[in-house]
Amino acid sequence: MKIYAALSAVTLAVLVATTSYAVEPDEMLADPALEERARIISQDLKCVVCQNETIDESNASLAQDMRRLVRQRVLAGDSNQAVLDYMVDRYGDFVLLRPRVTGQTVLLWFGPFALLLLGGLIVARYIRRPSITTVQALTPEELAEVEALTKDSNTRNDS
Amino acid sequence: MSEGTSKPSSGRLTAIAPIIIVLLLVAVFAKRLIDVQDGLDPNQVKSVLLDTPVPDIDLPPLPERGPGLATENLKGEVTLVNIWGSWCVACLSEHPLLMEVAAENTIPLHGIAWRDEPQASLRWLARNGDPFDLIGQDPFSEAAIAFGVTGAPETFVVDSAGVIRYKHVGPITMTDWTETIAPLVEQLRQ
């Protein structure tokens, strides 16, 4: 039973701990409000070494130094945007985890929606297209013709 | 009577559309592959600092190997700035070339000892040779981030006005040197 309890505890811990943060206690700013801002900024910045992690999550040494720099800028009174701009000036848009909308990234941002719209239109066209041609009732003349044909089924009518 | 023969062209187009799309994709992928073969690494980040002045740095020297490296040392003539560290394996592979460049003594080659213990840097230089004119210590990546460095080694060509004109990512090979960097230095001197 004890083993079972321990196993469930470990499983739960693994399930809960989906994101880990790399910020070490000695890196944190004393002011919780400034630290919170630094965390928010860090989550928008890409670790340029590992490229798929934020600097907030990454244990790479360069990410650690970038976190330190972010905190220095925040302490110096920079706005969040100013800190991001500072990094973009050095690394380009590449450093942002959420790419800005520019001529180069417009396809990235809106391409999926355009494709979805296109797909939706195609589907809509298929749905609207009548699958069974509606049969119109025969006119009295046609009825008479059918009547004549069925009565005289052996005779071929060329008209 | 008219059913089925109304829009023959549209039907044909729908039929060949997938083939056209596949061919377009093949063309895009093929171009990418050819780019990589030609040495264009899509993962490589083009520096936004090209053709901008070198960042403001004022780095302390390694112990008893003064002076350090500051922005004003990168003005007045064409210089090379190499980011390295004793921990950097790839730096060792380009080191013989840097030694040769230093031996020719035609261009100042400055080093930034990135994220390194000063004593470790000095030991590494004692063991492998010291090609650098000035060396600045950058223990907290301040200069590295200012230069937009993503890994070591990286080498910058700075013109006489102190403007970054070229960035080389990774170890410099003999081909890089003779075909790209040396001609650029020559051109910048004129």
Regions found by a protein language model. Give the residues of each.
Chain B
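Aromatic-flanked redox-active Cys/Sec active sites in thiol-based oxidoreductases
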Residues: 82-88, 114
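Short gly/ser/thr-rich secondary-structure transition/capping motifs
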Residues: 37-40, 60-66, 135-138
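N-terminal targeting signals for export/organelle localization
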Residues: 1-60, 190
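Thiol/disulfide oxidoreductase modules built on the thioredoxin-like
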Residues: 126-131, 138-189
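A short beta-strand-turn-helix
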Residues: 57-80
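A generic structural signal for alpha->beta connector loops
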Residues: 51, 56, 106-107, 131-132
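Hydrophobic beta-strand anchors of alpha/beta hydrolase catalytic cores
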Residues: 80-81, 109, 155
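Structural microenvironment flanking redox-active thiols in thiol-disulfide oxidoreductases
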Residues: 92-129, 138-145
